[in-house]
Structures are given as structure tokens and as C-alpha cells.
Amino acid sequence: MNELRFDGRSVIVTGAGRGFGRAHAMTLASRGAKIVVADYGVDVDGAGSSPEPAQLVAKEIEAAGGVAVPCFASVTDEEGANSMVRTALDAFGRLDVVVNNAGICDPHLFEDMTVERFRRMVDFHYLGTVLVTRAAWPHLLAAPHGRVVNTASEAILGNVPKSTAYSAAKGAVFSFTRALALDARRCDIRVNAVAPRGITRMSEPPMLARVFDQPEEAFVNPFYESLQPEGVSPAVVYLAHESCTLNGEVLICGGGRALRLAAIESKGITREKLTPEDIAENLEQVMDTTDPQVCGLDMPEP
């Protein structure tokens, strides 16, 4: 198969100053994309800011022979989102792809989660995804093959402790991806997401030890060390490419694996007049996922 190239394409990558975003930006640039390295340089919990991460990655890309411009802007407000789009148009004259990657990590038990912390998590992960996509949308409509790649998480399955805010925000990204894909079916825009498996500053041993209440040593082993950020980028590259036919899908990717993340439904039970007792008496059948069906993924034509 020919290499998936992005020659002449303009791509915004948010949170591109570190971790997954940096890996995506570097990989896309190596395949010919012109990159807006968008990053507000916040701490892992969303506090502070610095232009340095975006500047350094843009220089890295240029040093490797690619084309990139930094953009010091936040995804959490409209002006920041608009600034990213303006940067792409001013520098490259077009916008073809948005990779919504920016995010933070601030694990707390629910009873310790303040409203301010909850809102900050939603602002970075969900609202940031919405604002940047909304600012870019008219230009993606005008592009030959507009693409949006969001960042979801397996945490939406409820398998990560101390993550009520994070998991809820990522769940919103999952639903937003599905809903926007339905709207986008009328044009040649594809909206999908990745659920990364990899180690960044948000998932290094000290952070994992805090989340799972285990010693750091439990997360220092060859398996975790194999989960480099670059291992997620193949899914991002495919979903961002004009040849991608998927729409409204989420791909788990990392550590050499790529697989589909989808909601399923069991066959369940059917009664003409369903009662609570019917559910109680047939709970095993209701919950049986031996022969599941992927739900909510039919994309009807407009």
C-alpha cells in the first residue's frame, strides 16, 4: 500500500507541545502536512501557561525538514480557538484537518472534586474540542476532504479510579464525535476519535500510583515502557487522511495494537407489557452479551 501522505494539507494539532500531541504533530509533518502546533503550555492539572512547548515542537518539526508554526492559545475559550484557525489560514492559506488532543489530568475522589476542578476538566477536554471544531468547521466544509480527529479514552468505561470528572468529559467527547459525525454525513467530512494507550506526563508512574493507590514501582516494567506516545499516532494519521472511510468511530491505539471501541447492546428480553418483575426474573438474559450487537452506529443517508 502506498504511504498515506498529507502534502499540501494544513493540520491543527491541539496540545501539540508534549506527549501524544507532539507525536501526532511530528508524524503528520513527516508525511507532508503543514502543522499548527497549538499549545497553551499548561501544567498537567491545567494551571499556568507557557509559549515554550509549542515553540520547541515547531522548531523540532522544522529541523526535521517539515513545516510548522506555533500557536500559543487555549482551547478553553473562543478567542483561543479562533486564533488557532487564523494561524492556519495566515500561514498556509487553508485548513484541512483538526486533531483535538489537548487535555489535563487532576485525579480526585468524587467527594474531593470541587466544582471548579470539574469545570476545568470539562473545559479542556470537552468544551475545548467543541470550540476548536466549531471555529474550524466552515473551513473544513470548504476543504476537499475535511477531517476531525478527537481524543476519547477507555476511561469512559468506568475503569479508572478517581476520574469522575475526566471520564465524564471524555464520555462527552465520545458522544460529540458520534453526533457530529451524523451531521457531517451530508458532506465529505469525517469525524472520528482515538482512545490512546500510552505513557505521557498524564500517565507516568507517579500519576498512576496516585490514581490506583499503588507504589510507583508497580508501573515501571517493560509493558508500560512499550506504550510510547508515538504508538498512538498511526490511528490519528489514518483517521486524518482523505482515504479514511470511517465516520463516528473510536479506535483504541497503542503498544502495537489498534482496535474498535464501540457501545454494544445485548439481545435482552421483549414483553408486550414489560414489568419490573420481568427484568428481575430474567436479569441474566438481559445482561447476557454472548451475541452482542453494536448499537447506534448506522449512519443513514440525508
Residue ranges and their predicted role:
Residues E3-V37:
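Canonical Rossmann dinucleotide-binding motif of NAD(H)/NADP(H)-dependent dehydrogenases/reductases
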Residues Q214-P302:
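C-terminal helical subdomain
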Residues I61, L109-F110, T114-R119:
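Substrate-binding pocket helix/loop in short-chain dehydrogenase/reductase
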Residues E111, G158-T164, R186:
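Active-site loop immediately N-terminal to the catalytic Tyr-X3-Lys motif
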Residues T133, A169:
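Active-site helix of classical SDR
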Residues S153:
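Residue(s) in the substrate-gating loop at a strand-loop-helix junction
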Residues P51-Q55, C71-R86, V115:
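The beta1-alpha1 cofactor-binding region of Rossmann-like NAD(H)/NADP(H)-dependent oxidoreductases
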